[in-house]
Design a protein with these regions (language model features):
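A short alpha-helix capping/helix-coil boundary motif
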Residues: 11, 21-23, 68, 102-105
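Catalytic donor nucleotide-activated moiety binding site of glycosyltransferases and closely related
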Residues: 1-20
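C-terminal amphipathic helix plus adjacent low-complexity
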Residues: 84-132
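A donor-sugar binding/catalytic signature common to diverse glycosyltransferases
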Residues: 22-66
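Nucleotide-sugar donor-binding patch of glycosyltransferase catalytic domains
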Residues: 8, 48-99
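Short, contiguous acidic/charged loop-to-helix segments that flank catalytic cores in large enzymes
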Residues: 17-24, 76-79, 113-116
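Short, flexible, glycine/charge-rich loop motifs used to bind or transfer phosphoryl groups or to couple energy/partner
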Residues: 4-9, 24-25, 44, 69-72
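A short, terminal or domain-edge coil/loop segment
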Residues: 11-12, 47-59, 108-117
């Protein structure tokens, strides 16, 4: 998460990532305990390592109108939804996360949307392309 305008002290274990055009997010994902994101596709990569996500959706209605999302987007979130800055601040300061519910949501989400197996991925892709 990067936001130079946060107006409260954060615990020492929370780090900001400075945006860099050559930065590879995948290098740090395994080191991250909890990801705070919005609608970014990085969440999909992060869920593969089965860790917790907080969705900071302060502009949901605006984003839904302008960009669009699937109808049940909020219902299938594999993590906690935060709707405003005050909730985000409280969530970060409390460091309290409903681990069982979130872990269960991650498992269900992964099974429903990404359950294709991780074994022999390169071989499967090669065979798929070969058979086109």
């Amino acid at each position: 998460m990067y936001n130079k305008n946060l107006s409260f002290d954060l615990p020492d274990n929370i780090k900001f990532i400075n945006p860099d055009p050559f930065f590879d997010i995948n290098e740090i994902l395994p080191k991250v305990s909890i990801l705070i994101s919005d609608y970014s596709s990085v969440v999909t990569d992060y869920l593969l390592i089965k860790k917790k996500v907080i969705f900071y959706l302060h502009d949901y209605e605006k984003y839904q109108k302008k960009i669009g999302l699937i109808d049940n987007f909020r219902k299938i979130l594999p993590g906690r939804e935060i709707k405003n800055y005050i909730e985000l601040k409280r969530e970060i300061k409390n460091k309290q996360f409903n681990n069982k519910r979130i872990n269960q949501n991650i498992k269900l989400h992964m099974k429903k949307y990404y359950d294709v197996g991780y074994k022999d991925s390169s071989k499967k892709i090669f065979n798929f392309i070969k058979n086109i």
